[in-house]
Amino acid sequence: MLGLLSSANVMAADGSLVRSAASTAYALDVVQQATVTVKGHVTDPNGEPLVGVTVTEKGGKSTVITDIDGNFSITVKPKSQLELSYIGFVPTTVQAKPNMTIKMVEDGKELNEVVVVGYGTQKKANLTGAVTSVDVNKSLGSRPIADAGRGLQGVVPGMNVVVPTGEVGSDPLIKIRGQVASINGNNNPLILLDNVEIPSIQMVNPNDIESISVLKDAAASSIYGAKAAFGVVLITSKKGANTEKFEVTYTNNFSFQHLANDIKMAGLEGLRYTLDAQINRGGAMPAGGFWRIDEDSYAKAVEWQEKYGGKVKYNDPIVYGRDWYFDGTNKFGYRLFDGVKAMIRDWAPSSQHNLSVNGKSGKTSYNIGLGLLNQDGMMRAAKHDDFRRYNAKVNVSSEINKYVTVRAGALYSDRNKRYPGVGTTVADPWLYIYRWSRLMPEGVNDQFGNNLREPVSEVAQSNTDNLQNKYFNVNLGATFNITKDWDVQVDYIYDHQTTDKNTSVIEYSGGQTWYTPSEWIDENGQQVYVDANGNQVPADTEGAMPGFRFPYQNYYSNNTISSVSNYSYKRNQNTLNAYTTYRLYLGKEKEHAFKFMLGMNLVSSDWSSYTGKKTDLIDPTNPQFALASGDQFISAGRNWDSQLGYFGRINYAFMDKYLFEANLRRDGSSKFPKDLRWTWFPSF
């Protein structure tokens, strides 16, 4: 097309290019022919229009949905194919053509699929709320993921899962339909394992999960109360086998992590940009902050790359004369440093091991799951940056008779995270890597083998902090089948959670690269001279220059002193769930289907916390309270709270075609004053 357009252009007398009217008209015609508008009508097998069918151009960006009459209109490229998808129907692909009529086929398997909802289950075909059922085998089973939260990334529409810090062992941040939080609250969804709230989705081994449902609308709050204001993630753990068999399964995976996007720092072009910006704004030379640059030093930086680029490694010591120069007022750098490479590994290993025992003997079924996760972090400079998790899960169920089934289970999770104590460093390790010019030495020692005052060095010097989270719960329950259509379920759960965090503040040391360097004096008290390659030479050598070095100092962050700190948190919680479900069918062909559910939920918690700190470490490499001689600070707290909720749900289906659902919860919390303690949560 470009060739045809250029042939229609003519050159004016002044040398300018002029496009003819014919060329312009032809170009418009080509653009108009690049897309076509396709209209169509979508029905079910009986010819009834389908509302809300998603129609997408295959391999393109155009997407529309059918209107109330099942009609759609979409603009696509000629000869495109259309992909149609709709819950309960088989996905369909057709060739795009004018005035289409498309008949979709029902997916019987999907329609009969059972989805876990609040205190019960529903056929997928009868869902009225915004519920997404996750394909666990596809999303979790085939991927080397550290936890279920990371496995849900990009899986559930309307749910965002991110790991803001990127640290191993950190909890993924899950947001459903928006980011707005309540005052002094959060906007995290309620996470439930077998109808019991758990503090973190990391406490569940992905290998122990049977199903995951995500509740996204107001119906979640109307069943689970105020805690579910931002949605609910319902996790159901694996139960025993349905047939007489005994299975032992061992799985493992070994993987390596790498940054999704390489962090590219500006090279010589960044220095050129700094110079040009200073010139354009009429600023005085030299440009830059702690490390300066002018035309002469820029030329030497270019020369340095030609001479030493690829030969001097990123972590080789910085050498005066070769890599930098001081004129008595300003420091000038020639060498570009790579703080990102010095701080971040190229690859970090990870391994997972899972053992499961599943079986059934008589009317008793059981499932036992054991898991181990070892994961290294990406911080190359740290002494330790890793995460280890142990998991154990047991579920046992036994049918006493046709009326009573009892069950018991237990869950144990131990998460241990080791990481550098960068919270006490002077310079934020990530901020300054981006903020500083690449002339600022990072990830190197000076030519005398001394540390420098910079983020990579501070991370390397920092002690290893430790965060350990332990969680244990045990549950007992029973199901009473009073009639074929009426059952009662009762579950009691006790859980215990502990958190221990150990941190320390140490004194750092390093050559001061921020400010004025000092003269390089030898052991005889004489000024040292160097040449342009950094070699020591006599003072009368041609090109010799007086040497300088970075003054070495010990320092603390934010005027603190060395210390060791410990934070300890303990929580005990008791949960009682009891609900009954009754199914009623009316009509000759049972075309009227009702389901009634009533229940109550009681949660009581008591917790205590302790924080201790002691200053003046005797041995900074071994931070312990017994090895500190300074002041001691202690604070502690204890509290309890309880929540009681009564809830109910009514479902009605007429011929499995017309559906109605209503939910209602009356919720009370001891956290509020008596006159504000109770409230209603309805949904229809």
Describe the residue ranges of each PLM region:
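Short, small/polar-rich motifs associated with maturation and membrane association
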Residues: M1-A392, T405-R407
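Transmembrane beta-barrel architecture of outer-membrane proteins
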Residues: D147, D171, F230, S350-N354, ...
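Short glycine/threonine-rich loop-to-helix capping motif typified by GTGT followed
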Residues: K674-W678
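Short secondary-structure boundary/capping elements
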Residues: T66, P349, R638-S642, I650
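Residues on the lipid-exposed face of transmembrane beta-strands in outer-membrane beta-barrel proteins
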Residues: S237, Y250, L355-G359, V394-S398, ...
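Surface-exposed loop/interface segments of Gram-negative outer-membrane beta-barrel transport/assembly proteins
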Residues: N242-R335, L373, M378-D385, N391-Y471, ...
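Outer-membrane beta-barrel channels and translocator barrels
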Residues: I145, S350, S361-G362, S397-T405, ...
